[in-house]
Amino acid sequence: MTADILRPEPGTRTVFRWRKWDGGPHWVHDCIYLGHDRWGEWFGQPEGTRSFRPGREVLTRAASVTLVPPSGDHALTVNVAPPASSRIYIDLAWDVRWSDTEVGVPTGIDMDLDVVRAVDGRGTWID
């Protein structure tokens, strides 16, 4: 995710569009672009923000921040937990980058392999 021309200003509302490996739709997260630094691109979701995919729509139970490193091979989300059931959620991904067709919109392929650290005693596991 290094295309400066496609990067919005910090504080800009945007959507993060995930897709399945076959190109089908997956999660879409309403979020706020927070900025970038040497670690990557930062996105925030305040409590009550909408996330949806085919067949499911949720409002976030807690605020979160997501980091996408320059490698574009994963997205690390840190949740305020509780009330969220997980503190850490890592989506292993492919081709996470700024969209070529929508200015200021991050997109990526969700590999459906995640690392989760729960706060309810389940510990850390691979989903």
Segments predicted by a language model, with ranges:
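Charge-rich, low-complexity N-terminal segments
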Residues: 1-63
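Generic marker of residues within folded, mature protein domains
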Residues: 6, 23, 80, 103-105
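Catalytic core of tubulin tyrosine ligase-like
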Residues: 41-82, 89-99
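Short, surface-exposed coil-to-beta transition loops
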Residues: 26-30, 61-63, 72-75, 108-112
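Well-ordered beta-strand positions
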Residues: 33-35, 68, 116-117
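Coil-to-beta-strand transition motifs
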Residues: 24-26, 39-40, 71-73, 83-87, ...
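Conserved, surface-exposed functional patches that form binding/active-site neighborhoods
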Residues: 85-127
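Residue-identity detector for threonine
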Residues: 2, 12-14, 49, 60, ...
